[in-house]
């Protein structure tokens, strides 16, 4: 890509993000402490940014790190933030830290999920939970359907699976809460096609109310979600939390989450202990 083409791509991306965030050039100039005139010149290609300026603007626009790297490359610069593979990331100190967290949380479920809520790793308590839900979670983190197809285990797709909804007490509360979270994340990452596809699939799943399509900004979700799991004679009650890593220099790590389950009654606590053996 030649210099002129790069300038056009960067200018278009900058203007897109500013519009997506609902900011005027003056708003952005104040947030980034840059003159509105310079913002205008950058968006028309009359000025070229430095890599430092790209990062300043990205931070002012609250652009995710993965997209900030894209913005830097569009301006002709190298990526700023590392994007290691999951295997590479979890084969080092982080993997050992996750294992320690898993061990300390036993016998209660805990799992690591990626930005699309695919299960990356789980402790033994998590494996038992999936077994109760009728999910065959192998060591490779895949699930086999009745047709024999193989794919990642996705906790949101399981939650919205019509065949498993009866297993979730107060399914509308749990599902609507997670859908609002996904809608917020999709707004924050508008270029994430896989995330948009997941959101579209869930919104259009059978039995999902039409009014869930439009997120209600007045609804404030609690930091913890209560969930009841039912399977045959088994009933388990948990509070679930989602923890994110604070990783300002690593895209992959910043997109990982730890989903933890805490029992809310003695019956659930004892059953988790018995299942782990």
Regions found by a protein language model. Name each.
Residues 1-21:
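A short, Lys/Arg-rich alpha-helix, primarily the initiator
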Residues 32-48, 58:
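Recognition helix of helix-turn-helix/homeodomain-like DNA-binding domains
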Residues 90, 96-107, 113, 120-277:
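Hydrophobic protein-protein interaction segments
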